[in-house]
């Protein structure tokens, strides 16, 4: 078996570097097509989240290749410039890492639940784009299954340690904040709006299209069209942006000319909010790195021992499958 992975994550690079390696669904197909032109690469899966971008490859036995070089090529960056910001894993270290990743124990917020869906979505998208092979399919399925077992056996996370609740904690620590604007009606945006409403904040959420059936609107939320977001800034105390846009949703040149709130929270990668905004008078800007700073779980060491015990069983199952498949090929 020759599986290799390489990637960049929050432990290796700050958000301004990580966001350069984020891929949209529309760009992934081209990346996969280029990767699979190499006849020695049988399958590829890219896991791209707000905190990491990782490339998993199933290759010809004996082939040595650094997937991070391929990621740099796909993102049109010089590998040498970022060569000290990535990690490379091979063999059993790959599946162990993937299992731990799916369990949430490699996340900035220990044990968070969103990553298991992101891992599942990564393999599903690779399959849809004809990029995965049986080795990666089984490896990702094993990782997701092991994560489900960990989640049902151990209590690793609580709602208070999710990204939205971490943002809420920041908002609650500030005085005189009652009106919030959430930019983005995706999963994180809706969750953020719902949590704000539950905690008594007057909350407005942006919609790209205001037609019945096109958007899910959190109960109790007010709505405005996305194009009206700058005008709405005049009437809010905090703005939270959580979109998948490749461009800034808020630019300093447009904000500087209007009355603006003093608290901005950016939950996106690539970042939604122009980082220059923090240079404005009396403004605080939080991005994912600053939101997660200081998140500590005192029980991690003991919990990690239990997680590894569960994962080991699934890693054994994977290798048993692989050896069985290899014998079938030889007979």
From Swiss-Prot:
| Pfam families assigned to the protein according to its UniProt record, in alphabetical order | GlutR_N, Shikimate_DH
Protein name in UniProt: Glutamyl-tRNA reductase
For this protein, the record's SUPFAM superfamilies field holds: Glutamyl tRNA-reductase catalytic, N-terminal domain, NAD(P)-binding Rossmann-fold domains
Q: What does this protein do?
A: Catalyzes the NADPH-dependent reduction of glutamyl-tRNA(Glu) to glutamate 1-semialdehyde (GSA).
Give the E.C. number(s).
Answer: 1.2.1.70
Q: In which pathway does it act?
A: Porphyrin-containing compound metabolism; protoporphyrin-IX biosynthesis; 5-aminolevulinate from L-glutamyl-tRNA(Glu): step 1/2
Which residues are catalytic? 50 (nucleophile)
Which GO molecular function entries does the Swiss-Prot or TrEMBL record give? glutamyl-tRNA reductase activity; NADP binding
Listed NCBIfam families? hemA
Which residues are involved in binding substrate? 49-52, 107, 112-114, 118
Oligomeric state and interaction partners are given as: Homodimer.
Site annotation Important for activity: residues: 97
Additional free-text comment from the UniProt record: During catalysis, the active site Cys acts as a nucleophile attacking the alpha-carbonyl group of tRNA-bound glutamate with the formation of a thioester intermediate between enzyme and glutamate, and the concomitant release of tRNA(Glu). The thioester intermediate is finally reduced by direct hydride transfer from NADPH, to form the product GSA.
Q: Which processes are annotated in GO (biological process)?
A: protoporphyrinogen IX biosynthetic process from glutamate
Into which family does the record put it? Belongs to the glutamyl-tRNA reductase family.
Sorted alphabetically, the keyword list is: NADP, Oxidoreductase, Porphyrin biosynthesis
Binding residue positions for NADP(+): 184-189
- Native organism: Acetivibrio thermocellus (strain ATCC 27405 / DSM 1237 / JCM 9322 / NBRC 103400 / NCIMB 10682 / NRRL B-4536 / VPI 7372)
Gene name, per UniProt, is hemA
Swiss-Prot/TrEMBL domain comment: Possesses an unusual extended V-shaped dimeric structure with each monomer consisting of three distinct domains arranged along a curved 'spinal' alpha-helix. The N-terminal catalytic domain specifically recognizes the glutamate moiety of the substrate. The second domain is the NADPH-binding domain, and the third C-terminal domain is responsible for dimerization.
**Catalysed reaction, written as an equation:** (S)-4-amino-5-oxopentanoate + tRNA(Glu) + NADP(+) = L-glutamyl-tRNA(Glu) + NADPH + H(+)
């Amino acid at each position: 078996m020759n599986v290799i992975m390489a990637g960049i994550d929050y432990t290796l690079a700050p958000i301004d570097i990580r966001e350069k390696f984020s891929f949209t669904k529309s760009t992934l197909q081209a990346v996969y097509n280029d990767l699979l032109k190499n006849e020695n690469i049988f399958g590829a899966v890219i896991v791209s989240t707000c905190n990491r971008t990782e490339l998993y490859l199933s290759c010809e036995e004996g082939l040595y290749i650094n997937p991070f070089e391929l990621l740099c090529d796909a993102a049109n960056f010089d590998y040498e410039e970022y060569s000290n910001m990535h990690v490379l894993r091979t063999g059993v270290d790959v599946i162990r890492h993937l299992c731990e990743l799916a369990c949430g124990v490699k996340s900035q917020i220990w044990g968070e639940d969103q990553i298991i869906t992101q891992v599942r979505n990564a393999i599903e998208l690779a399959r849809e784009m004809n990029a995965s092979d049986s080795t990666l399919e089984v490896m990702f399925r094993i990782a997701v299954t092991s994560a489900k077992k960990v989640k049902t056996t151990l209590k690793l996370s609580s709602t208070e340690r999710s990204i939205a609740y971490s943002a809420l904690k920041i908002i609650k620590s500030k005085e005189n904040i009652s009106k919030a604007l959430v930019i983005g009606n995706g999963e994180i945006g809706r969750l953020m709006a719902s949590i704000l409403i539950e905690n008594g904040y007057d909350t407005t959420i942006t919609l790209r299209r205001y037609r019945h059936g096109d958007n899910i609107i959190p109960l109790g939320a007010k709505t405005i069209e996305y194009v009206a977001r700058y005008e709405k800034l005049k009437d809010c105390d905090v703005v939270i942006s959580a979109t998948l846009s490749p461009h800034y949703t808020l630019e300093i040149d447009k904000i500087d000319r209007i009355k603006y709130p003093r608290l901005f929270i950016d939950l996106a990668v690539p970042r939604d909010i122009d980082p220059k905004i923090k240079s404005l008078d009396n403004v605080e800007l939080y991005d994912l790195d600053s939101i997660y700073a200081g998140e500590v779980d005192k029980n991690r060491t003991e919990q990690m021992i239990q997680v590894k015990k569960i994962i080991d069983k699934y890693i054994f199952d994977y290798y048993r499958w692989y050896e069985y498949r290899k014998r079938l090929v030889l007979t």
